Amino acid sequence: NYGINNPFARILTWPAARTWAPWIAGDTIRFAPRNDGQAKYWTTSYPSVATLPMGALIKAVNALDHGLFLTPALFWYSDNDQVVQAEATDRIRRQWGADWGTVATRAYPDLQPGDDPAAHVVAGAIMSPGQTDMMVAGILGWLKEIE
């Protein structure tokens, strides 16, 4: 998550946002769960100010020199993500500190009906069950490649 896919996300890091942001966003952020698993295991209601640390973290991480990062990284995300900015993730991946395919590897999920319609949670039994086996195999294969 290197950029929130919402034009109002920038206010998360504005001065004194903890005081006035709830006036704009409301005190609580809520969403309707997509299925029983999400209703049971996910937080579907939380204080709007809980998003402020995420905004600060995104700002701080984007300010880093990612060219210095030599740790292998697998970026597995959808270009159609409606929650975060896929182009921001791609920008960071391209800046990562080694050649493409060795340290910063890109994987593309093949989302199908029944998977997350927001293309954000690209694996897992609750949101994208059709992707989980493929992602596990992809991660294990990637780990073998970088050994």
Map each language-model feature to its residues.
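Serine-hydrolase catalytic core
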Residues: 38-114, 129-144
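Short helix/strand-capping connector loops at secondary-structure junctions
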Residues: 113-125
